[in-house]
Amino acid sequence: MKQDSRFPNLFITDHPLIQHKLTHMRDKDTSTRTFRELLREITLLMGYEITRNLPITTKRVETPLVAVDAPVIAGKKLAIVPVLRAGIGMSDGLLDLVPSARVGHIGVYRAEDHRPVEYLVRLPDLEDRIFILCDPMVATGYSAVHAVDVLKRRNVPAANIMFVALVAAPEGVQVFQDAHPDVKLFVASLDSHLNEHAYIVPGLGDAGDRLFGTKN
């Protein structure tokens, strides 16, 4: 994992397998089915990185031979919250890794000025829970900021929030950092820039359309 000196809260997971799979996702000729499978696989691989610092305690267990104090995740419970709609494609990968996690949903769409409009919030109980927000793209950054706002307004501490995306534009990362410098943002790639239509370049295209096989 590496960082960019411009963005202290940004962490880039540069594992070769992740980069290999991301290249195939970028390919405009990749089928909907393959795109969906790759999104799930990359999210699973990124999950290992973003959960590496979860607090650990010990639990007494009986093996077939002896009793031993073995490591387990301490206390806090996990919740996966995809930002609809494209974030749904990432939640399965994280659930493969942590099948006991609760799942919430935050629904937003982009208005003509690219600002997020909220239409749905469904969350599990908040107490002592670590939230992993997921959305394949951080383009303008407004939807990501809004998703974190939803949790902070409900008194979820910043230390209990992580945001994971596949690709991000520097413009969006700056917006996210300005709004939430205390929340970690994990991505597989920091791309070049946003174009005049607020699409990430080189990016993936419209992740939701490619994931579900729809046309914008």
Curated annotation (Swiss-Prot):
Allosterically activated by GTP. It is an enzyme of class 2 (transferase). One of its GO terms (molecular function) is GTP binding. Pathway: Pyrimidine metabolism; UMP biosynthesis via salvage pathway; UMP from uracil: step 1/1. Belongs to the UPRTase family. Catalyzes the conversion of uracil and 5-phospho-alpha-D-ribose 1-diphosphate (PRPP) to UMP and diphosphate. This is Uracil phosphoribosyltransferase. It comes from Burkholderia orbicola (strain MC0-3). The gene is upp.
